[in-house]
Amino acid sequence: MFTINLLLYIIPILLAVAFLTLIERKVLGYMQFRKGPNMVGPYGLLQPFADAVKLFTKEPLHPLTSSTSMFIIAPILALSIALTIWTPLPMPNTLLDLNLGLIFILSLSGLSVYSILWSGWASNSKYALIGALRAVAQTISYEVSLAIILLSIMLINGSFTLKTMSVTQENFWLIITTWPLAMMWYISTLAETNRAPFDLTEGESELVSGFNVEYAAGPFAMFFLAEYANIIAMNAITTILFLGPSLMPNLSHLNTMSFMTKTLLLTMTFLWVRASYPRFRYDQLMHLLWKNFLPMTLAMCLWFISLPIALSCIPPQM
């Protein structure tokens, strides 16, 4: 029974990731006035399965100078963390109802740094190591802004439980009242998932492919799956925090459809950003966080802390 539950949990996420790669290639294709993949199956719908078969049937090679055990563990850890992040998400029901769901998600996203660092270090390649160091610095930096934004949202929500967010947003979405936080959160999730225009970890012109340059076949596919699973998970969290998952007890299937639609639209925006914007320079990336986002998020957090205290001092009106 445990195995069946595990498969029912993992397979839909992996299928969503597989078709996200197809959607990305199609969207980028049409934005660049070309078709995208259209040969494998009708309209190219079987392309993800062809890619999976190709990657997982090739021989997984590793450099002679690499640290073998760490080199193998890194992609497994990356995919495991990416799949575990989904457990406390209410869609509309959770797999694991945690009281500290948001702290759990923040901790796991912090752990994902280790898989990147290990892969860069174990590859014993200067390109992989530079890519890994960039990724670690970027991820750790943007987690600061993500944590402060989450703290502000939790002050509004009054709980660290994700399920209560739908009750908090019963009358209106939080994106309406906290739109500066929502904008900073969305940009920070782009940086956290190493997506364009913050994809400095895989700057093709200087680092070839970044921290996974020495990976091939199955292990490379695991990193790929982990990256796209994180993208969908981050957009699902954005939907829960700012776009109020619907609360209709009698129409639970509509709740799920609404949640999926919002998440898909946010994910499509990720692809739109990739097609539209050039890559940031590294110093611009860091200045954006430390000189712009950090002061603004701290100011907003102090505002949400001080507002209830200030209002509680007002004497009751007759």
From Swiss-Prot:
* Record's keyword terms, sorted: Electron transport, Membrane, Mitochondrion, Mitochondrion inner membrane, NAD, Respiratory chain, Translocase, Transmembrane, Transmembrane helix, Transport, Ubiquinone
So where does this one cross the membrane? 3-23, 70-90, 100-120, 136-156, 172-192, 223-243, 251-273, 294-314
Any Pfam family the entry gives:
NADHdh
Q: Which reaction does it catalyse?
A: a ubiquinone + NADH + 5 H(+)(in) = a ubiquinol + NAD(+) + 4 H(+)(out)
Question: Where does the protein end up?
Answer: Mitochondrion inner membrane
Q: Does the keyword Chaperone apply?
A: no
Task: Give the GO molecular function terms.
Answer: NADH dehydrogenase (ubiquinone) activity
What's an example GO cellular component term for this entry? mitochondrial inner membrane
Give the GO terms filed under biological process for this record. mitochondrial electron transport, NADH to ubiquinone; mitochondrial respiratory chain complex I assembly
Top-rank taxon, per record: Eukaryota
Protein name, please? NADH-ubiquinone oxidoreductase chain 1
Its source organism is Sarcophilus harrisii
